[in-house]
Amino acid sequence: MRVLVSGGGTGGHIYPALSLMNYLKEQDPSTEFLYVGTERGLESTIVPKAGYDFKTIKIQGIVRSLSLENFKTLWYFCTSYFKAKEIVKEFKPDIVIGTGGYVCAPVLYAAANMGIPTIIHEQNSLAGITNKFLARKVSKIAICFDAVRKDFAKYEDKVVMTGNPRGQELANAQKDDSYLASIGIQKEKPIVLIFGGSRGSLRMNESFIEALDEFEKKDYQVVMVTGQVHYDKINNLITSLKKQLQNITVLPYINNMVQMFQNTDLVVCRSGATTLIELTALGLPSILIPSPYVTENHQEANAMSLVEKDAATMILEKDLNGESLVAEIDRIMNDEARSKEMAENSKALGITDASSRLETIIHSLVK
């Protein structure tokens, strides 16, 4: 089988694609893959490092206000459509799968027009503009949250709940009991992990600094991941405050988030779709702080999917400070029954066979 995959821009589009590709390769080592992305997206480094063939097309996103840039976007779409058609014709895929990002539009549009089975995978609880555009053309629409069904109401017969392949990958990962020691952490107390995504969050870092004295007194320990860009500033600030941290570990980033999650008791984080899939796959309780800087405020909608099921609580960024952060953590960590219930609710939301479900759809489409 020959599988062409397209998706890019952010890790939330790329890692689910790689998880699915890895799974399909395990099931059938003869499967051939081609990944189509952009030169500027993260996929241009991540995908080749993962060992997959990679080709690029030139595309840019739509500016949501009236702008002459959208004429350039339209031009890029037209030219990239013909480039995508050439790539598809040359590779001769049995199926084409899009995991989101603007690069998917010309690739899946071309494949659909050529009569090749196509699947889009929507990770969020609000559909992205590219997937909305492609919904009419594709064979199947795979989703991770029930809330997104309304965005595909016209195409309900195409919609299939699959979950996110990243969840299956995490659920099958083996816990490494030596991991914490390898990054300088002793599991003497329960661990609260705070992180603001791959680039970190200025407001979350500021709230952490405000809460330093309180965190030092707690019966749980705090691991704060600042993001590489903020690390020196936070470290220097802690030094200038003459703080000797006994109950807190500050790290710029974590290379193996899977192992960190598996050794954590509570997570405080943004509510990107892939992060939520990881939390529910592992059954972790969480405090979600949606980024207000994303398209259509979709992270708040993502968070509500867990909050409504009592698998997480939420603090809006405008309400976030040291006091509110500590208070919310204490409400969960100081109530064992509450923490356990949230963990069970989180686990119940997890779909841990997403790649298997997608494989079934693929085989139903590839005759």
How should each PLM-predicted stretch be described?
Residues 93-95, 251-254, 262-277, 284:
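Acidic donor-binding loop of glycosyltransferase active sites
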Residues 52, 116-117, 265-266, 283-291, ...:
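Structural loop-to-beta junction motif characteristic of Rossmann-like glycosyltransferase folds
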Residues 351-367:
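C-terminal alpha-helical cap of glycosyltransferases
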Residues 32, 42, 53, 112-176, ...:
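Active-site-proximal region of nucleotide-activated glycan assembly enzymes
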